[in-house]
A protein has these predicted regions:
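Short, amphipathic, aromatic/basic-enriched membrane-interface segments that mark the entry/exit
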Residues: 1-2, 140-143, 188-194
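Small-residue-enriched transmembrane helix-hairpin modules in multi-pass membrane proteins
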Residues: 60-179
Length: 253
């Protein structure tokens, strides 16, 4: 029962993704779900020294196989259930999984640091919501990476470099790593409110091969809701820690 409830969001996301023939729904749900799983494991201090145990490896193998299968199925559905050409599907799969490396490499050789946008690309969603900037839909234009094969996936680094330059991005990455370490240590100590920035850090990292997760206000609302839950419910973490670590949460009556 607990396992079913744990995987229920993924099942729902896959069903919606198949109905909408959309990879976005599935991928973003997996990212948020796994960021939550990582946060839970750290809170419970569950096998932190063996984070990638046999169970995790089996899960990753199964998830990778399932993703490839879903990619092929969705690609076929998007082509109006036409002829399934293995070569073309394989080329699109390679472009989706690895094309960002070539796309980002080609783009970064053509840039200059003169036009810095100060967050307009990385934080396009919140800035658009507040009316500070007008978000451009479609993110970035496609670029040829091999023959007629193109992609518009450049990783989150493109947005960071456009916003803060290459040097500024390097400094920001150092600060992000330091901040992630601080939040991790606070969660280990039982300060559950720090789960919000920690899981956000994990989600940003997991989604970074595609684009900044801050492009999507609907995703950011997940953490806004979580923050509201902690602030309104005022959970109190029990101070009774034993060799098994975290013991539970008690709520005010």
């Amino acid at each position: 029962r607990e396992s079913f409830l744990c995987f229920l969001p993924l099942i729902i996301a896959i069903l919606f993704g198949l109905m909408e023939t959309s990879r976005f729904t599935i991928i973003t749900t997996v990212v948020i779900w796994y960021a939550g799983v990582l946060g839970a494991r750290i809170t419970l201090q569950e096998n932190l020294n063996k984070f990638f145990d046999k169970r995790s490896k089996r899960f990753f193998l199964f998830a990778s196989t399932l993703f490839v299968g879903l990619f092929i199925l969705l690609d076929w559905l998007r082509q109006a259930q036409g002829e399934l050409v293995a070569y073309l599907v394989l080329e699109r799969l390679k472009a989706y999984l690895f094309g960002y490396l070539a796309a980002f490499s080609n783009w970064v050789t053509m840039i200059h640091d003169g036009n810095i946008q100060f967050g307009q690309s990385t934080f396009a969603g919140p800035l658009s919501l507040t009316g500070i900037v007008e978000r451009k839909f479609g993110s970035y234009g496609p670029i040829l990476i091999a023959g007629d094969l193109s992609t518009n996936i450049y990783t989150a680094l493109r947005g960071l470099i456009m916003d803060f330059s290459i040097l500024g991005t390097g400094m920001i990455m150092i600060l992000i790593g330091w901040f992630g370490s601080i939040t991790y240590q606070n969660v280990i100590r039982g300060k559950l409110f720090f789960l919000i920035p920690l899981t956000l850090f994990y989600a940003f990292t997991l989604y970074s091969p595609l684009i900044s997760i801050f492009h999507y206000n609907s995703l950011i609302m997940s953490w806004v809701i979580l923050a509201a839950f902690f602030l309104l419910a005022k959970p109190i973490v029990q101070n009774s820690w034993d060799k098994d670590g975290f013991t539970g949460i008690v709520f005010n009556q």
